[in-house]
Amino acid sequence: MLQPKRTKFRKQFTGKNRGLAFSGGKVSFGEYALRAQDRGRLTARQIEAARRAMTRHIKRGGKIWIRVFPDVPVTKKPLEVRMGKGKGNVEYWVCKVQPGRILYEMEGVSEEIAREAFKLAAAKLPIKTQFVTRTVM
């Protein structure tokens, strides 16, 4: 699963997830892409589950790029532990996503296969997404 190899600090503040995606909004590598329409937090497990769904559908053809990386640690205190005594341990890693952010890209397959693969991937994600193609200028 995706997570940083090392970080400067073990735990982070929760923070806010506001605004629109300024970077990562263009189709850079592939021909087709899956773009976020909502804001939310994608866990490393959700990113991996969507990737597996896509790769199973396209089989051996095509290439997939994952354009998001879970770099925010989420902490949780153990069950039945009273409040206080410091912050809990890191439970999992998330990626904060704003509307307009490209999540996955794909090339080397037909548009119908790409649409179906992204539809399967979108079912694994907790946010609304949209299928986009690269625009040639």
From Swiss-Prot:
Keywords: Ribonucleoprotein, Ribosomal protein, RNA-binding, rRNA-binding, tRNA-binding. GO terms for molecular function: rRNA binding; structural constituent of ribosome; tRNA binding. It holds the Pfam family Ribosomal_L16. InterPro entries: Ribosomal_uL16, Ribosomal_uL16_bact-type, Ribosomal_uL16_CS, Ribosomal_uL16_dom, Ribosomal_uL16_sf. One of its GO terms (biological process) is translation. One of its GO terms (cellular component) is cytosolic large ribosomal subunit. Part of the 50S ribosomal subunit. PANTHER family: 50S/60S RIBOSOMAL PROTEIN L16 (PTHR12220), LARGE RIBOSOMAL SUBUNIT PROTEIN UL16M (PTHR12220:SF13). Belongs to the universal ribosomal protein uL16 family. Binds 23S rRNA and is also seen to make contacts with the A and possibly P site tRNAs. This is Large ribosomal subunit protein uL16. The lineage of its organism: Bacteria, Pseudomonadati, Pseudomonadota, Gammaproteobacteria, Chromatiales. The gene is rplP.
